[in-house]
Every structure is written in structure tokens, then in C-alpha cells.
Curated annotation (Swiss-Prot):
Entry-linked NCBIfam families: efp (TIGR00038), PRK00529.1 (NF001810)
UniProt GO cellular component terms: cytoplasm
Protein's GO biological process: peptide biosynthetic process
MF (Gene Ontology): translation elongation factor activity
Record's protein name: Elongation factor P
Keyword Cytoplasm assigned: yes
Family: Belongs to the elongation factor P family.
Metabolic or biological pathway: Protein biosynthesis; polypeptide chain elongation
Function, in words: Involved in peptide bond synthesis. Stimulates efficient translation and peptide-bond synthesis on native or reconstituted 70S ribosomes in vitro. Probably functions indirectly by altering the affinity of the ribosome for aminoacyl-tRNA, thus increasing their reactivity as acceptors for peptidyl transferase.
Length: 187
């Protein structure tokens, strides 16, 4: 159990049998009336985001979420296979649990797997990943009608928009949360 004064970003709450993580929160003390805490919660399993208000001082059930460092090994049908670096146990995680993170998942990549009661909840990649451009059309100088970007296919199969000067074979730094191009990697 945690009080509203214990709220922090990333805390996982158990509300009505479902797991919710706090994205952001704000303590509000109006001039008239009792204080309250306004939160933005994200459902751990479905990804749904909702706004919820708690009265100040209310106790809320918290969930124990273990985050383990694991290594992604390979994709097997509809499952992704990860290995725990400490115990060398292999864990099979479904495509639905991995979600969009699979777009930037490379073999032997270090990731964090969050579990609750030994059930995998989600996979967290590093914030930035370095990937090689598998294919992109050559950029033409003066072609600025699209804002100076063009589509590029990465080695994982993900497609992102990159500046016109990027060529096939370049190594890029990509934000794994939203798929934005961050820069070239000097090798």
C-alpha cells in the first residue's frame, strides 16, 4: 500500500485488478476544499492512458514489478526468446507483450523485461539504439518538398524517416520509444 504522497513516475499501482503505471502526477491544493492528486495512468497490458484523480492521503494498492536485465536471442514463430544474464534461463515472450518494441529489436541486444508474479508485462529497450540502414533511395539535392526527409528501411525491417543525406549502409542512432532519427553514428 502506498499513500498519494508516495507517488512517483513509474510506480505501478493495482487498481480494480489491473496494473497501471504512473506517467505523471501533480499534487493540487486548491484555495478552497481538500487537496488532491491528479494523475495520468497507463495500463501496463493494454497501453491505454487515462486521467484519474485521488484525494490526498488515500492509500492505493501497489504492485511489485521486477525488472530483469535480459538479452534478446531470437524470434521463434509468434514468440521472442530472451535469456536472463544471471541464471541463463531462456524466457519465451509473446509478440503481443513485446509490442512495437520489436521494430528495433536486434539479436544479442540487452533489454529490460518487467514481470509481475513471473508473468512478463512488457519489454523495455534502451532509449537509443544503433541500427544500419538496409535500403533508402538516394537523396536528390534541392528536393525539399517533403521537408527534407525520406523513408529508410533499417536492418530490423522498421521504416523511419531520415534526412536526405543518409545513404544505404549508414549506421544511425534511433529513439526506440518513438522511432525518430537522432543522428549518424561515427564508426
Amino acid at each position: 500500500m502506498a499513500s498519494t504522497s508516495d507517488f512517483k513516475n513509474g510506480l505501478v499501482l493495482q487498481i480494480e485488478g489491473q496494473l497501471w503505471t504512473i506517467i505523471e502526477f501533480q499534487h493540487v491544493k486548491p484555495g478552497k476544499g481538500p487537496a488532491f492528486v491528479r494523475t495520468k495512468l497507463k495500463n501496463v497490458l493494454s497501453g491505454k492512458v487515462v486521467d484519474k484523480t485521488f484525494n490526498a492521503g488515500v492509500k492505493v494498492e501497489t504492485a511489485t514489478v521486477d525488472r530483469r536485465d535480459m538479452t534478446y536471442l531470437y524470434h521463434d514463430g509468434s514468440d521472442y526468446i530472451f535469456m536472463d544474464g544471471d541464471t541463463y534461463d531462456q524466457v519465451s515472450i509473446s509478440e503481443s507483450t513485446v509490442g512495437d518494441q520489436s521494430r528495433f529489436l536486434l539479436e544479442n541486444m540487452a533489454v529490460q523485461v518487467a514481470t509481475h508474479e513471473d508473468v512478463p508485462l512488457f519489454v523495455e529497450l534502451p532509449v537509443t539504439v544503433e541500427l544500419v540502414v538496409k535500403h533508402t533511395d538516394p537523396g536528390l539535392q534541392g528536393d525539399r518538398s517533403t521537408g527534407g526527409t525520406k523513408p529508410a528501411t533499417l536492418e530490423t525491417g522498421a521504416e523511419i524517416n531520415v534526412p536526405l543525406f543518409i545513404n544505404t549502409g549508414d549506421k544511425l542512432k534511433v529513439d526506440s520509444r518513438d522511432g525518430n532519427y537522432l543522428g549518424r553514428v561515427n564508426s
